[in-house]
């Protein structure tokens, strides 16, 4: 049966709830029912329940990603072809008009388009910072995006800079603000002499996400201000390497004698509740194409310290609505943590200014409405 609205299949590699998956949820939600969406996730992804709770139909395919494991390398091409055929069949059975790849390393949509004899349209979202990826992979992915996709969406100007200047099929579409708005009371900056200052690091435990830098900086900052407390909150996505990374961080904190002031917790389903319980949000990632975590902190008005690692620099005005520190610069992180923790007036300024800034820059016309325009343009070319 034909759909009353055009159907877009969102293909996402997330095996758990990630920033990329949440960003798409925030973007597609306001576009229903004018455009219908169904998601395609890896088999066994824990993101399925979240999407189904939002009312989406979810399909699964056994995606295989390129990795250092020999078994994955051997399986990659055969499974890419098989999943491409399955995706083409799924699109045909569901009468889908468009496949939206939620990152450009997922090549399944291109294979599905090939098997459809060019009938399927493909839109590719670039959510990694390609400049930081192994170029032996990134360059072919870029070529495919520029030549095989009908539209390429970059989540920031930092990402857009990797693609050919002036390419008509490449544009920047920022991720939207939380679709449900604020559900909790407005954030209030608090502080008094000798009061604890709580620092939140909200990120999955993945190497490169910067928790190690935060812990190193906190060791020095805590010696300067014993009222500081640091909480790491995030999931491991069920991956052994992420579990090992968390254990390394916990062992490091214990070896430094900080187990009473540094805490480690699991995945937080409600970002707003988590963030509003703290005084400062930290994000010291080594590379971010955008950073939904930073955007959420700014939206809720929780003072932010972030590294200059790509996309975050576009999310706020450094020094006016947040602090931006050089990438991998632990002394600068220490200085920012100590100075902001001890300056309630500056935290209040950041809280007020950040809320205003993101609501203007990431208004619907610059985010999900622009995405809808891209869908319509691609569909109109059929």
Spans of model-derived segments:
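N-terminal strand-loop element at the rim of the active site
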Residues: 10-18, 30-74, 159-162, 238, ...
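Conserved acidic donor-binding segment of nucleotide-sugar-dependent glycosyltransferases
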Residues: 317-319, 323-330, 339-344
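A conserved mid-protein helix/loop that constitutes part of the nucleotide-sugar donor-binding site
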Residues: 18-26, 197, 206-223, 244, ...
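Short hydrophobic beta-strand element within catalytic cores of glycosyltransferases
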Residues: 303-306
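Aromatic "clamp/platform" in nucleotide-sugar-dependent glycosyltransferases that forms part
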Residues: 267, 286
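Short His-centered aromatic/hydrophobic patch
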Residues: 83, 101-107, 126
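Short, structured helix-loop element that forms part of the nucleotide-activated donor/catalytic region
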Residues: 50, 231-259, 346
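Conserved donor-binding/catalytic core segment of Leloir-type glycosyltransferases
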Residues: 8-9, 191-209, 215-218, 230-233
